[in-house]
């Protein structure tokens, strides 16, 4: 007789690791279909787990989703399979690490036409660090351009596995998916049976429900959680009542108890989004565990940018929208700030540029807030002449040059996987971006893994787009933070009629300051509309102007009525016009269009 699926040795918790577009979400759909969690008629949209419009549109998974499937294996026993879907993009590696901590196994999905990509390798190392059982899967084997054996050799070189342990599937056509599920049952270890220990549960994701408050998705690692228990969160020591607990099989299914090994959800009327920190440990308040689960780290934003509402009266709407977004996104950090040019807004910290774009799009789409974004920048460390250290995440906070001793900037270690034909192009791009070339490994006869060290500031802009264009889309990249290093950095200010515009300031390397200033002045000249008076656009480092462009004034032809006539009369009219323009210039403020703030993002185009 089949044992009830709640038995801990009949649970399999696993995730899927893959690069963008390698077919992860489609594979998840096939698993849901084969285990009868969903039938085809319910699949109104492909990629059931990617439930944000943005996720489907960009073909990426942003949030960690979890779903429970029941499966009767070939041994006649019933198993509970918990699939935790993970994002595959470089910016979301923290989401991946949290999802991995909730699993015992991982499917390493590689596209048969693309081979191993940089992000796959990065997430694979995270999975190996977490001690997960890896099941390699080659997907899209039915495509005419697939190279199954070549990709298999890459995987064997990467993790030293036997050829017959690599599975071959086509998620779209449903080929090999049954064998894959059987492999999950046989190869992924069951969770440890720790029911007798004090409760410890890991929160790997959370969403905000307008009726129920925060819903925390968790994996029970030790102990038992019952409905009505008083639970305590380690990060802030707050105590809540477990109003509802249960499991997720696409929709929430309430249950009375969750035991060690289970993946489920917890609702306990948490009003403040910050109380259910993703990565936190939940325990019982009456008989608490002594220490939290390891592996949780406060997420560190790498890229900072100012977000300002286009209409200043939408400031409160922007605040509310950011609060709601921050609930579903543990990695978004924001603090209020003011700008002379843009008014009230927020300085936000993001994991990377894709993360920043997604937050901006979600603010505009889901919450209807129109925003202006300032130039993205990184966090600098400024050592003053008196020995104090100041952290600068906004160019306007940069101290006066006379007080600065040294400036340090964050460096990252980057691996770029590409075809060997593009090595020259990538080396050139690396040199342009102040990169330090380390070495190159050959993955096979045509693909290489190049290692560089870059200042983070040089890659947060448009590095990924440039890399894709010079390699015709074949290169993929992954980076991780190393340390801070000393650099010759300066603050470049933009002045309009001698008035600095704080939102256009930027911190750049001294060697690039002149070129950057010249390009920016030229770009702004084409964007800022003509005024009734002359407008001087200047780029300056401290008090030294390094570049200038002038927008000439719109002028009425005051001599139109002087047919011929006395020169002194004409001169008098021109002098009068000049006086008027001068007065206008003193009181007038140059209206800066929104495109001017975006100009910096596309300075090279």
Swiss-Prot record:
Subcellular location: Cell inner membrane
Catalytic activity: GTP + H2O = GDP + phosphate + H(+)
A GO cellular component entry from the record: plasma membrane
Gene3D superfamilies: 3.30.70.240, Elongation factor 4, C-terminal domain, Elongation Factor G (Translational Gtpase), domain 3, P-loop containing nucleotide triphosphate hydrolases, Translation factors
Domain tr-type G: 9-192
UniProt EC number: 3.6.5.n1
Molecular function GO terms recorded: GTP binding; GTPase activity; ribosome binding; translation elongation factor activity
Membrane topology: Peripheral membrane protein
Stored HAMAP family: LepA
Family as reported in the entry's similarity comment: Belongs to the TRAFAC class translation factor GTPase superfamily. Classic translation factor GTPase family. LepA subfamily.
Protein task: Required for accurate and efficient protein synthesis under certain stress conditions. May act as a fidelity factor of the translation reaction, by catalyzing a one-codon backward translocation of tRNAs on improperly translocated ribosomes. Back-translocation proceeds from a post-translocation (POST) complex to a pre-translocation (PRE) complex, thus giving elongation factor G a second chance to translocate the tRNAs correctly. Binds to ribosomes in a GTP-dependent manner.
Protein known as: Elongation factor 4
Organism: Chlorobium phaeobacteroides (strain DSM 266 / SMG 266 / 2430)
Gene that this sequence comes from: lepA
């Amino acid at each position: 007789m089949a044992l009830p699926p709640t038995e801990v040795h009949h649970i399999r918790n696993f995730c899927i690791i893959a690069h963008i577009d390698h077919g992860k979400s489609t594979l998840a759909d096939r698993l849901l279909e084969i285990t009868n969690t969903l039938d085809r008629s319910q699949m109104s949209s492909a990629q059931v787990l990617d439930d944000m419009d943005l996720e489907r549109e960009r073909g990426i998974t942003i949030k960690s989703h979890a779903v429970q499937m029941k499966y009767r294996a070939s041994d006649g026993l019933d198993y509970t399979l918990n699939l935790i879907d993970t994002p595959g993009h470089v910016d979301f590696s923290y989401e991946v690490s949290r999802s991995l901590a909730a699993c015992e196994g991982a499917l390493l999905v590689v596209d048969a036409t693309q081979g191993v990509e940089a992000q796959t390798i990065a997430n694979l190392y995270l999975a190996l660090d977490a001690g997960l059982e890896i099941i390699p899967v080659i997907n899209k084997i039915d495509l005419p351009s697939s190279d199954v054996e070549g990709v298999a050799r890459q995987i064997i070189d990467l993790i030293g596995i036997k050829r017959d342990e690599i599975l071959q599937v086509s998620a779209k056509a449903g080929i090999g998916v049954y064998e894959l599920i059987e492999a999950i049952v046989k190869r992924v270890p069951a969770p440890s049976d720790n029911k007798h220990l004090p409760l410890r549960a890991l929160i790997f994701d959370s969403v905000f429900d307008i009726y129920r408050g925060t819903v925390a998705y968790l994996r029970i690692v030790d102990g038992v959680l019952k409905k009505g228990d008083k639970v305590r969160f380690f990060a802030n020591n707050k105590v809540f009542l477990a109003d509802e607990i249960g499991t997720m099989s696409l929709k929430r299914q309430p249950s009375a108890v969750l035991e060690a090994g289970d993946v489920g959800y917890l609702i306990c009327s948490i009003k403040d989004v910050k109380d259910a920190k993703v990565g936190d440990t939940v325990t019982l308040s009456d008989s608490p565990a002594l220490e939290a689960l390891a592996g949780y780290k406060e997420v560190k934003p790498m890229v900072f940018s100012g977000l300002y509402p286009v209409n200043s009266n939408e400031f409160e709407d922007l605040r509310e929208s950011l609060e709601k977004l921050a609930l579903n996104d543990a990695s978004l950090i924001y603090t209020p700030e003011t700008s002379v040019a843009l008014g009230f807004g927020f300085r936000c910290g993001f994991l990377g540029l894709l993360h920043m774009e997604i937050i901006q799009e979600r603010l505009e789409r889901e919450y209807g807030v129109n925003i202006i974004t300032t130039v993205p920048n990184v966090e600098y460390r400024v050592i003053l002449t008196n020995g104090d250290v100041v952290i600068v995440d906004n160019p306007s906070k940069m101290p006066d040059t006379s007080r600065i001793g040294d400036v340090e900037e964050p460096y990252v270690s980057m691996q770029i996987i590409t075809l060997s034909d593009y090595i020259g192009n990538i080396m050139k791009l690396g040199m342009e971006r102040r990169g330090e070339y380390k070495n190159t490994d050959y993955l096979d006869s045509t693909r290489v893994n190049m290692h560089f060290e870059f200042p983070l500031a040089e890659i947060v802009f448009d590095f990924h787009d440039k890399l894709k264009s010079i390699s015709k889309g074949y290169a993929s990249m992954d980076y991780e933070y190393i340390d801070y290093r000393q650099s010759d950095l300066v603050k470049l200010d933009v002045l309009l009629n001698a008035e600095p515009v704080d939102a256009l300031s930027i911190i750049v390397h001294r060697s690039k300051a002149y070129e950057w200033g010249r390009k920016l002045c030229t770009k702004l000249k084409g964007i800022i509309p003509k005024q009734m008076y002359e407008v001087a656009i200047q780029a300056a480092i401290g008090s030294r102007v390094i570049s200038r462009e002038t927008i000439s004034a719109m002028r009425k032809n005051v001599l139109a009525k002087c047919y011929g006539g006395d020169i002194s009369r004409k001169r008098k009219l021109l002098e009068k016009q000049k006086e008027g323009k001068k007065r206008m210039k003193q009181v007038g403020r140059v209206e800066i269009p929104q495109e001017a703030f975006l100009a910096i993002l596309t300075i090279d185009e």
